[in-house]
């Protein structure tokens, strides 16, 4: 059996794994154990009442968090003409068509989000094997294939998160950093849950949001009492 580190022992002693914490208390616990030498991310896992084996029950989408994620996001945009100018003005880091595709084929991928206008998908389609496995392929369901590329760039830069359930019906995403205030983290979490409720499949029956847990990169993980949200 693996030996528990001093930090792991402290977390085990300080966190009640059988308890669902009131949200402010949950955040306070996370902050107490977020002692890494870097600013840890605050991540969330949401267990959904869906059957992930059924395609019509899978949940996928995007939402802009009111306080952002605390990360600087680099955005690449496939578009041309007036849309290219609009994307640059909105803050896109890379804008192009075939030239941008060639960079990506060479392995130059210094970006976190890829956005494309519909007319550019003929170029982006060639990059499926490169972008797909990295979760970077533009998709209209999350707003990354759109005629309004400028708005998509602004959303990505201002703290938009994308979410998709895994094979166990769980959504994993981030809601900020450990140095965010309790109010900022709570409001970001509320925004995510509101977006998930709006995206509830019509075929999903019973309780939709079954469990909400928050954790930091290197620290504690706690269940959240949904009544406190």
Curated annotation (Swiss-Prot):
Pfam families: Ribosomal_L1. GO terms for biological process: regulation of translation; translation. GO terms for cellular component: cytosolic large ribosomal subunit. SUPFAM superfamilies: Ribosomal protein L1. Gene3D superfamilies: 3.30.190.20, 3.40.50.790. Keywords: Repressor, Ribonucleoprotein, Ribosomal protein, RNA-binding, rRNA-binding, Translation regulation, tRNA-binding. GO terms for molecular function: rRNA binding; structural constituent of ribosome; tRNA binding. PROSITE patterns: RIBOSOMAL_L1. The keyword rRNA-binding applies. InterPro entries: Ribosom_uL1_bac-type (IPR005878), Ribosomal_uL1 (IPR002143), Ribosomal_uL1-like (IPR023674), Ribosomal_uL1/biogenesis (IPR028364), Ribosomal_uL1_3-a/b-sand (IPR016095), Ribosomal_uL1_CS (IPR023673). HAMAP family: Ribosomal_uL1_B. Binds directly to 23S rRNA. The L1 stalk is quite mobile in the ribosome, and is involved in E site tRNA release. Protein L1 is also a translational repressor protein, it controls the translation of the L11 operon by binding to its mRNA. NCBIfam families: rplA_bact (TIGR01169). Part of the 50S ribosomal subunit. Belongs to the universal ribosomal protein uL1 family. This is Large ribosomal subunit protein uL1. It comes from Haemophilus influenzae (strain ATCC 51907 / DSM 11121 / KW20 / Rd).
